[in-house]
């Protein structure tokens, strides 16, 4: 009996010592009003309670509190402040403060001192940052100039949105949390079964970039239950092939691109180029198509069933200085980075020139897409056999050799 008790105790200790956790990161965007600059950390150590810690400064020095909400979408390419309704997966519909029975996205009021907020934590029980229908990874947190009336939420005047941030999977190594208490692994994730997911990353330059200012967008859109379409347009790039990857973390706390971590992958996958079926989830090859009219703008187009759009929501993405050759040479430093946000508009498109011949391997380096008919590049797609471009010429060579021998 004593032995059984000891075993139960040891199992309990081991499970506690190796308990997984979820951590996410959110960096506030500056809007035309508010002058907000700062971040939010999201941490759950029990899978039930989500603790959101705010650290930001604003130009609203007169404010003693700010209303905060979790909104349905992480970004809107047409309107920065239209991010959908308050996140409400349980269909409560009525606004409220955490002390009552609010919608999942009603964070409540953030207390401020001279308009600034320092290390203030609010705990919520419905939203989470793990792989289920209540996950807010890829969605947004919005800050408003007004506040909730918690005694009568119907009278709340939260005012205009003064800032928002896209919630990405966080890199705990770049946080100020006591990591000695977090001995498991970070299992933060978007909801992997989210149907018809559309992800959009706004790309901006890292401090690695010298000279040109990099900016652009990368779009991940589900085509059907299996395939997604990945398209991108990024300006400020040098005329050469640039490695392109989805990374483990949607954490842009580091300006040099290191906090987004390594490539997004699952156990057993190895770094490679498309269309390898064993490559990392995040291995998308290279940008190498350029326009003669816009020589500093790189374009990308690819269709794949190797990963879903829902899985990459809330992850980071990077454009590298050089070519990813599919080996240990993955493209050098990260010159551009972004967080993949969940967006609403199913019709949104980057309007790429679809008559180009697309190449994501880029073995021949960069090329002008509008002159692709004269290029000797192959167009790669996961729904095409990767060897088809060499099999037919090989048999043609054999037949020609036989005919020549008979002459």
Swiss-Prot record:
Zn(2+) binds at residues 263, 271, 280, 283. GO terms for molecular function: copper ion binding; superoxide dismutase activity. Glycans are attached at residues 51, 205, 224, 256, 321, 364. InterPro entries: SOD-like_Cu/Zn_dom_sf, SOD_Cu/Zn_/chaperone, SOD_Cu/Zn_BS, SOD_Cu_Zn_dom. It is found in: Cell membrane. It catalyses: 2 superoxide + 2 H(+) = H2O2 + O2. Its cofactor is Cu cation; Zn(2+). Residues 407 are cytoplasmic. Residues 1-19 form the signal peptide. Residues 20-386 are extracellular. GO terms for cellular component: plasma membrane. Protect the extracellular space from toxic effect of reactive oxygen intermediates by converting superoxyde radicals into hydrogen peroxyde and oxygen. This is Extracellular superoxide dismutase [Cu-Zn] 3. The lineage of its organism: Eukaryota, Amoebozoa, Evosea, Eumycetozoa, Dictyostelia.
């Amino acid at each position: 009996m004593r032995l059984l008790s000891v075993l139960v105790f040891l199992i309990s200790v081991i499970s506690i010592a190796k308990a997984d956790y979820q951590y996410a990161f959110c960096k506030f965007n500056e809007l035309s009003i508010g002058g907000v600059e700062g971040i939010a950390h999201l941490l759950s150590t029990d899978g039930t309670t989500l603790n959101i810690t705010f650290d930001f400064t604003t130009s609203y020095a007169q404010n003693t509190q700010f209303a905060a909400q979790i909104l349905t979408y992480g970004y809107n390419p047409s309107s920065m402040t239209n991010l959908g309704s308050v996140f409400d997966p349980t269909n409560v519909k009525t606004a409220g403060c955490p002390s009552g029975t609010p919608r999942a996205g009603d964070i409540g009021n953030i207390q401020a001192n001279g308009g600034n907020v320092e290390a203030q934590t609010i705990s919520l029980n419905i939203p989470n940052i793990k792989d289920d229908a209540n996950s807010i990874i890829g969605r947004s947190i919005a800050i408003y100039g007004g506040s909730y009336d918690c005694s009568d939420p119907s009278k709340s005047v939260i005012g205009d949105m003064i800032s928002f941030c896209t919630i990405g999977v966080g890199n705990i190594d770049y946080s100020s949390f006591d990591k000695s208490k977090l001995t498991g692994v970070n299992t933060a994730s978007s909801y992997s079964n989210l149907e018809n997911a559309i992800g959009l990353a706004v790309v901006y330059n890292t401090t690695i970039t010298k000279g040109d200012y990099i900016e652009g967008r990368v779009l991940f859109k589900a085509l059907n239950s299996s395939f997604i379409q990945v398209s991108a347009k990024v300006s400020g790039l040098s005329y050469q092939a640039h490695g392109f990857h989805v990374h483990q973390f949607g954490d842009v706390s580091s300006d040099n691109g290191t906090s987004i971590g390594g490539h997004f992958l699952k156990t057993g996958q190895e770094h490679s180029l498309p269309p390898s079926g064993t490559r990392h989830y995040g291995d998308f090859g290279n940008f190498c198509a350029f326009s003669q009219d816009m020589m500093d703008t790189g374009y990308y187009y690819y269709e794949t069933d190797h990963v879903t759009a829902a899985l990459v929501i809330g992850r980071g993405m990077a454009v590298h200085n050089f070519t990813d050759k599919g080996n240990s040479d993955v493209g050098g430093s990260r010159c551009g980075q972004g967080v993949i946000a969940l967006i609403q508009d199913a019709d949104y498109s980057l309007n790429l020139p679809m008559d180009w011949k697309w190449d994501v391997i880029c073995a021949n380096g960069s090329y002008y897409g509008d002159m692709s008919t004269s290029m000797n590049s192959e167009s790669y797609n996961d729904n095409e056999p990767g060897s088809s471009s060499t099999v037919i010429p090989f048999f043609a060579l054999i037949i020609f050799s036989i005919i020549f021998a008979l002459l």
